[in-house]
Design a protein with these regions (language model features):
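Short beta-strand scaffold segments in enzyme catalytic cores
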Residues: 48, 95-99, 107
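Short, well-ordered alpha-helical microsegments
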Residues: 69, 94, 142-146
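Glycine-rich phosphate/adenosyl-contacting loop at the front of the ribokinase-like
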Residues: 1-60, 69, 154
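A glycine-rich beta-to-alpha transition motif near the start of alpha/beta enzyme domains, typified by
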Residues: 56-84
């Protein structure tokens, strides 16, 4: 299959089951088996899905030199995915918390750290040159890649995940 270049958010996501919205105040809630953490983010989710479909993927993303960043690297390696494009240049790895109720309603709190102000470091162009498709997810550090991918005459795909 083809080599796909993916640039997008990587974060550690924690989901929390709640009884409903609005969440009534209490000093402590005990949602037994209702709190889960996983490596996620649009970039990871797209790369993981395409990897499972048999494509060679190279995810380019920003994480931090922290425990959450270690978790990201371990999860990608366990999935058999390349970590070559992961840059540990943020002060900390982005994280999110998602509250969800039994009806499926959810509220997402996302801490992007300095993702929106930090570009991908130099060195991604050889991978972009070799790819058959540049998948550039909706995060600021992907924007500058549009011009490079166009200059290299690459097919470009972008996501729209919130309307």
């Amino acid at each position: 299959m083809s080599m796909l270049f993916i640039s997008g958010l990587t974060n550690v996501e924690t989901t929390v089951a709640i009884p409903g919205f609005p969440l009534p105040y209490a000093p402590v809630h005990y949602p037994f088996h209702g709190i889960q953490s996983t490596v996620s983010g649009v970039g990871v989710n797209v790369a993981k899905a395409l990897h499972r479909l048999g494509h060679s993927t190279q995810l380019h993303s920003l994480i931090g030199p922290d425990l959450a960043g270690d978790t990201v690297m371990m999860a990608l390696e366990q999935a058999g995915m390349s970590t070559h494009g992961m840059s540990r240049i943020l002060s900390a790895t982005p994280q999110s918390v998602i509250l969800y109720d039994p009806d499926g309603r959810r509220q997402i709190q996302v801490d992007l750290k300095e993702c929106q102000e930090t570009p991908l470091p130099d060195g991604y162009e050889p991978a972009l040159q070799q790819c058959e498709l540049a998948i550039l997810c909706n995060i600021n550090f992907s924007r500058s890649l549009l011009a490079t991918a166009k200059r290299l005459n690459k097919l470009i795909a972008c996501d729209v995940h919130v309307l």
